UniProtKB/Swiss-Prot annotation:
It is an enzyme of class 7 (translocase). The gene is metN2. It holds the Pfam family NIL. CDD domains: ABC_MetN_methionine_transporter (cd03258). It is found in: Cell inner membrane. Belongs to the ABC transporter superfamily. Methionine importer (TC 3.A.1.24) family. The keyword Nucleotide-binding applies. This is Methionine import ATP-binding protein MetN 2. Keywords: Amino-acid transport, ATP-binding, Cell inner membrane, Cell membrane, Membrane, Nucleotide-binding, Translocase, Transport. It comes from Pseudomonas syringae pv. tomato (strain ATCC BAA-871 / DC3000). One of its GO terms (molecular function) is ATP binding. Its main location: membrane.
Length: 335
């Protein structure tokens, strides 16, 4: 478990104190995929780098598996960091070393494993990330996705308990991003590894994360289960991220609906309710008519969800709305 207790970070620039992270309390449970989302300058990289003490907090306490890592000396910090792997946006591979040598680097530097065991471990890792045939290649011979897979294999070399991902998919195309996220999900599931990732893309959060924290100007403005935050955003920053992911401008959408008659509502379905024939049932029971103005069906990690924007006319609207609520469908009246 990772815990932040009133942790904050301030940089001194040109004689001025610049806060990068305001006092923050945070908890990441073992085995979770925890996402931190924010625009540039939000403080997410600072928060991530505080976990493995690449940054030293200005105050507060960071506790990992019951150990106060803010109190560790140099030897203790070296031991702790062997339990934390990290992958980066731009891969950080050594161009003059082969794929196998890059993956072996953490084990070689640790100096406590025979070469034969290192080679066996590297072979296992390359097989896990699907690069067994690329062991003798150099980074320049690899695609971006393959480079990131090497980075993931290297991060797993010391069998860490925690994997930190610093914008790990930002430099990749959408198809490659999807394959890397699938690999991270498999690693989390099979190795029971705790993963903390930062990103500026809500789609990344939606695909792989269990919990999310939304950051703005060094403050966590909203956090919770991904489904709750994604489907029912409260803070303006979160709402902007959701709109960017939906590629929908709500102001433009309101203009489009200006001529539509009736009450306009947005329904959100989760799990099995996503595929249930609820609209037809409610229409028959209450006598309402409806027009579908917009809709989508997608998944949040392994959970299906659907959103429909409807124009409802006629019949007993109050009874229809009560029926939606009774079926555990979240309803938002837009007009």
């Amino acid at each position: 478990m990772i815990e932040f207790h009133n942790v904050h970070k301030t940089y001194r620039v040109a004689g001025k104190e610049i806060p990068a992270l305001h006092p923050t309390n945070l908890r990441v449970d073992d085995g979770q995929v925890f996402g931190i989302i924010g625009h540039s300058g939000a403080g997410k990289s600072t928060l991530l780098r505080l976990i493995n003490r690449l940054e030293t907090p200005s105050g507060g306490q960071i506790v990992v598996d019951g150990e106060d890592v803010t109190a560790l000396d140099a030897n203790g910090l070296r031991r702790f960091r062997q339990q934390v792997g990290m992958i980066f946006q731009h891969f950080n591979l050594l161009a003059s070393r082969t794929v196998a040598d890059n993956v072996a680097m953490p084990l070689t530097l640790a100096g406590d494993m025979p070469r034969k065991q290192i080679d066996q471990r590297v072979a296992e890792l390359l097989e896990r990330v699907g690069l067994s045939d690329h062991a003798k290649k150099y980074p320049a011979q690899l695609s971006g996705g393959q480079k990131q897979r090497v980075g993931i294999a290297r991060a797993l070399a010391t069998k860490p308990k925690i994997l930190l991902c610093d914008e790990a998919t930002s430099a990749l195309d959408p198809q490659t991003t999807a394959s890397v996220l699938q690999l991270l999900a498999e690693i989390n599931r099979e190795l029971k590894l705790t993963i903390v990732l930062i990103t500026h893309e809500m789609d990344v959060i939606r695909r792989v994360c269990d919990q999310v924290a939304v950051m703005d100007a060094g403050v966590i403005v909203e956090q919770g289960k991904v489904a709750d935050v994604f489907l029912h955003p409260q803070h303006s920053t979160t709402k902007r991220f959701v709109q960017e992911d939906d590629q929908v401008d709500e102001n433009e959408q309101r203009d489009d609906f200006a001529h539509v008659q009736g009450r306009i509502v947005r329904l959100t379905f989760q799990g099995d309710a996503t595929y249930a024939p609820l609209l037809g049932t409610v229409a028959r029971e209450t006598g309402v008519d409806y027009s579908i103005l917009a809709g989508r069906i997608d998944r949040i990690k392994d959970t299906p969800y659907g959103q429909l924007t409807l124009a409802i006319t006629g019949g007993d609207m109050d009874a229809a709305f009560a029926r939606f609520t009774a079926a555990d469908v979240h309803m938002e009246v837009l007009r």
